[in-house]
Amino acid sequence: VHFAKTVWDSNTDLEQAAKASIESIKEIIQTRGANHMAALIAEPIQGNGGIITPPAWYFKELKQLLEEHGILLIIDEVQTGFARTGKMFAIEHYDVVPDIMTVAKALGNGMPISAFCTTDEVAKAFTKPSASTLGGNPVSSATALAVLDYIEKYELCETAAHLGEMLKEGLIALQAKYSLIKDVRGIGLMLGAELVKEDGQPASEETDVILEK
């Protein structure tokens, strides 16, 4: 397992950071050798990392790079999936089909369940049955099916896209009034506002106060 180096911070231009990320991955492939790399795992939007939202071109270029070297792309939709960003899965915003996708959390609406999805080509490699201590729970599975029905019936993707646009506009309006808000980023209802003090340092205390209220 190899972790790519962090190429972004709040003072870095996102476009430049995305380009640096691609170059970093190229360097890893060249250094370690593509034959030693089975797959690359990435979030379409970094959640706990700060709602870091790659530019529109990023995942297409990344997928092309990986395909050239026979490396699979695994997209982690555990936080971003199931209508949160205005589409069923966040990777859809980038018009890329990953080889494998992992999902959980919102799939069960509070019930414990996770799953992975693959392309037909990758699925063909899964030729032997596997065992799981807690897998196949019928209650969680029934809940997941109900969640999917609810998302489609009540058009939650469209709702998240619409409400997210309204919320983002409101946050940007607040940013214009208050220097505390350095940046607003994200897609749909997966949004984040970065708060900083006058010296540019993270406004941790102010963030705590806002969260408490």
State the predicted function of each range.
Residues 1-213:
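Conserved N-terminal phosphate-binding loop of PLP-dependent enzymes in the Aspartate aminotransferase
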